[in-house]
Amino acid sequence: MSNIINAVSGFARKHTFATVFFSLLTVFLLGSAGLECVKIDVRFLFMTGDMTDNPIGPFPTIFGNPYYDYPSTMFILSWLSTFCGHIVARWTVTLPSMIFGAYSIAMTWRIGEKAEKGLGLWALMLSLVSFEYFNSILGFGIDLPVCAAGVTMVALLQEDRLNIFFSTLVFAALLVFCFAIRGPMGPVLLGAGTAGWLAMSGRWKTFFSFGAAGAIVLAGCVGFAWWLLHHVGGDEMWNQFYEWQFNNRMDGGSVFFYLLGSLPTYAPLSVPFLYTLIAGGRALMKAPVGPWLGFLFAVEILLSIPGCQHTRYMTLAVPFMALSGAWGILHARLDLKLSEVWRDRIVRLARLVLVLIPYATMLGAVVCLIVSFFFVAPEWLPYGHYALGFLLIAAAVYCFRGHDSWTARFALASCCLGIHFVFAVIPAISAQEDSRPFVEAVEKASGENRVFFFNLNADHVGIKYLAEVNNARRKQVFFICDEDQTTEEHYAYRTVEEGFRMLGSEIVILREKYLEKLTQLAGAMNKKVVPQFEGKLGHRRYLAVRLVPEETPAKP
């Protein structure tokens, strides 16, 4: 056994980048296999599947209607990874995200090692301890390609005697790539981060060369988008694109959201990053950490312009948070006047925490299983994920036995946390939000009849139902809404008057808070509401009811 371990470690030392990339990709694939898409990823899965039945255009579609919030490039990649729509599941739809995520983490290691031997290893370890980062990678991480472009650009800029003309061409190509993936936001974020890196590096010739290239590329991309959208859909498509991609991104909000509010989201990765900022001193203005901070803060400051507030937009900055935190661990020191007794206590406590983390994560897999029994039917629990996570953590503990250095202990702890996220926490969330049991119950009760939703947003709730049924069945799902509800063109919305004309004794799905309103509307039509059962769509519970005629009293 020891010979095998030595052979594997020898190969890993010789081909570290490939080892990190393929190891992470394998773990991500195993962790996502068999899981259901949840939250916003359900919408992305639905859009990917919709490409099979509708022409592929500049935007993904829902029932053939363009959804202007995203270009279709990432969805085309996902559609190809589903074998052109033949296997539409979480692990196939999110395969491009997992590839870009594994690549970004491997490139984070390479950037750190290029700057200083050993720093890349610490940056790699810190990349494994952010649940939000992993959650994005194992979901439909539409911002991960932009993240991959960012680390690629910085890795290229680290090369000695780099030709400015060549690097400018690569930068321009990456801007086009980001525009194709993320629309105008993609190249703007990449350009801001790269500008921050160059400014803190003092490379002003490259800075102005990139700035000129960026302005030309962005203008060209917007001009091409204007021509393409007018050619495909006329003024209407361009106006919708402009509204969704520009106006909706500037809808107001706290300017401190990304600078302050998002830091807890990426904990515990953000802890060493904050330590670096506090203890780094004047060294923060110098290479290598200065340019990394320049990249990160340029992105965060740009995002802090009041607008849409989603932490996933910060994905591009995460590798540089890990790199800065790794530098702080190795070099930043707080000048605390502590006695030797207190220093010894702190060291002992830190060592104890690192020793306990692997065993805590093994216990955590068992705890996730036990807790899941209270929220999920036993037949829907991801037993295989919990078992595999437990075994992988045990294997990691075995492989690191006898290694007592701080680096080895931190490496073991970070590996165990990453495995715990992938094989315990994320599967537990997926199982807890799995909509299949409720959908199957509704389908069994309704047979071939239509299904109605009452006062529920189709884009957030109804799509969780639609994603679980086939294309033919989706055409039999309708959404009844009163005047207080916003309607969208993508779904089969009906007003109360229209919906009640269609409605017989079919199943109606609603939240309990709307039961009284539905009862009043039904009473006006001499019908009564009969509850059938309840269940979950996502993380909320919903009622399934029928409307049946009121019993007419017999004449005396």
Predicted regions and their residues:
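Transmembrane-lumen/periplasm boundary regions of multi-pass, lipid-linked membrane glycan transferases
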Residues: 44-50, 177, 186-291, 295-312, ...
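Specific aromatic-rich, kink-prone transmembrane helix
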Residues: 107, 126-127, 145-162, 173-175, ...
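Loop-to-helix entry region of an early transmembrane alpha helix in multi-pass inner-membrane enzymes
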Residues: 68, 72-76, 84-103, 136, ...
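Short periplasmic/luminal acceptor-recognition loop of GT-C membrane glycosyltransferases, typified by
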Residues: 406-549
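Short acidic/glycine- and proline-prone juxtamembrane loop motifs at membrane-interface regions
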Residues: 94, 132-146, 183
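Membrane-interface transmembrane helices that cradle and orient dolichyl/undecaprenyl
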Residues: 113-118, 151-170, 178, 281, ...
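Transmembrane-helix signature of polytopic, membrane-embedded enzymes
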Residues: 13, 17-22, 108-129, 147
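Extracytosolic helix-loop segments that constitute the early lumenal/periplasmic catalytic or substrate-binding loops
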Residues: 26-28, 43-66, 73-76
